[in-house]
Amino acid sequence: MSDNITRHKSQRWVSASKANYDGADWDAYSSNSEDEGLTNNIPQLPQVNIPESNNIAKSSSPDPSIGTCLRSDSLNTSVRSGNKSVNDDLDSLMHQISQEMTAKDEDVNNTSDPEDEDDAELKVSKTGYFAAYVNDEDTDDRESVKSDIESAKLAESATEINKTDNAKAESVSEVESVAESVKRAKVEVEPVQIVNVGEESFKGDDSEAESVKRADVEVEPFKIVSAEEEPLKGDDTEVELFKNAASEVETSQISVELQDEMIDPTTEIPSRIQGDVAISDDKGSKDAVDEDNWSKSDSHPESIGSQDKEEMPPSSINSLPSESQLSIQHSKEGDSNDSDSLLNGYGSEPSLMKDNASPVKLRKTSKTDLSYHDGYSSESSGEEKERAISEVSLGQYVVHSAESFKFRNPVRNSVLDSSDDDIDYTDEDGDLEVTKSGYFAAMVDEDKEIDDSDRHTLNNNDTDGLTADSDVNSITESVTKRLSQSSITQSDVPDQNSENDVGGYSDSSEDEEDGPQKLAFSTRESINLGKWKPDTDAFRSGFVTETIDINNPPEGYTVNEDGEIVEVNKNTTSNIQRNSSVASDGESQFNAFPHDVASDDDDLKTIADTKTIYDNQTIYNVPALIANNASAPALPTNIQITNESTDYVSSNDTIFKHVNGEAPKGESKLKEAFSSEGDEIPSVVHQSTVPNLDLVKLLSSNELHSQKLKKLNNYKEQLKEYDSGLQSWIQYALKSSTTSDKDFIFKDYKVNKHVQDAYAQADILSKKNSVANTVNQNVTHLKKKMFSSSMREKSKGLFSSIGKKL
């Protein structure tokens, strides 16, 4: 059973799990501590003798503007320490997998030739997964390198000739010859594979690594400090090796500065050549060069350019100058290109650790990069960032440290990335770079063309840091300029009316003599884009009836001298004046659902309101006229209300009166008798006034006391004789009526005719069946059944049982 299961495994994992697998088909690497001893396996660089010339050094001085193109960000060179503790289970698991998949490192002979090293460079299985990728990219790299270097050197030659004065002809010829030799050497040595020094860590001697890395910038005032003057502690062979490398880097600097303006920043440079010269930085305590030497090298670019050609060994052209030259060139391109690398916000830069040294490595592409690595480090140098990002963007392999393979890192660069949207990183220079075959190729090409044209314009005008105005700003400036010109032209004519200045914005009778006011009107006219406005007239006509045309008054009305429509009446004293909103009978209808008369489709016809009579009571009940009373007919203003008392009471009477009910002619089942009866309440004759006596006045008078007492007694008698009717009201309220209470209440409290008519016609209305009536009858019937059948018997049994117990 177990054998059947193992057959389904992939061939790669099965081979890795077997003991006899020796890694012959895999030239992988690992960043374990076992690779620390590979520092001594670096081959000896060849040397070519080139005659030194002091005259050339004295006469040649590069343009200071070119020297300042060097990246200032390279001063902040400090690499994060790669020795991190593994705190995550996932990290340790993936590290073990990386160790299992890593083959044993092959020994490389120090005395081996570059051709031998090139043969051992890419040993990948011809039937493996990565065979197709390696073969295709190997051919593409060789072709692209040849074309790129040739175009770069030709541009370099043209630029050198244009920028050098006639007085410096000798220095121009020397620099041009150096550039041509570099180009020929690079084309010849192309098959040779250079060990990726930028990804290795030299554990043997820290001071040697530091001297090589900073040899191109260690300068005293107008003097180059060679590598021999540094306190080197290693072997003599290694000192000689690194001294040659430093001289080669210095030599390539002149060509890099001269071709900065001519080479297209979008040119693809394979990472195998572009990023080979870089030495990982060690701790700050082991630095052999001070920060002062770094600043000196930036402040004296002339000395660097002049003495490079003096100390440049002849043997350094065949191998290393092209790589370092392209690497520095690419780092300078990042300063002026806004869209060089899309992967600055997409992928993450591999941290250059100490333990990732291996002379022979498996070529990796963007599809075969299976290792994790740390995200961008704020301490890493800008030049290393540019190199690493370019390697990823151009589809080349990048050496990543297994120590940086962390799941806990917020920024990752691997095929196992969960999402690319969570990486919110922007390069310190704002550079973006994408592949030429990617989705964003067309957009990036357009951006680069615009950026190149802008940069060329700025260089011609000798203006630094000046950006072109946006389209909106330019349009605004042009509009403002036109407005100011037009306003100044208009202000020169003081006799012009405001109508001539701004058509339709002001009356023609007003003269605009103020200049600023003209400008304001002109501005409004110029920038008015004609905003959309709703057709309020048509919108209103669809819902509300239009008012009467004064020119065509309705029949029976005429227009008076004030422009108001009034009725035509011979009797001028009784004229009823109405305002202009008076409508005829047909126009006074409220059309709640307007219908188009032109279309005689019966299906589109809607409900139309009947003729509406507007008076004091109905005007507030008509819809849509409450909020828009202007279209309603006007009410009369001079009508005299006549209060004529009549004995007749109409059906719409709203005054409460005591009237008799008119019972229908037929038999009535009601018990009430609606015959007129006399009022049973005794009428109390009330005196008109209540007896009154001013006691204060009486007591304060000068009359005799006998007269005062007599008046008081008379007042007392008058009060006794005064009857307020309270006793009669109390007796009527407390008396017992011979009739039933219902009849008594009905007779005493009936107030109007419609109440009595309702009671009289109740028997007829009760015969009409309705849902509510049926429900009420059923409920009443159920109640009768329940109480008659059950409750009555139970109540009898209850009382009988209680009586028995008693």
Curated annotation (Swiss-Prot):
Residues 1-88, 101-124, 248-389, 409-517 are annotated as: Disordered. Coiled coil: none annotated. InterPro entries: Fyv8 (IPR026248). Residues 418-432 have a biased composition (Acidic residues). Residues 280-312 have a biased composition (Basic and acidic residues). Residues 38-63, 71-85, 315-329, 458-500 have a biased composition (Polar residues). Involved in the resistance to unfolded protein response (UPR)-inducing agents. Belongs to the FYV8 family. This is Protein FYV8.
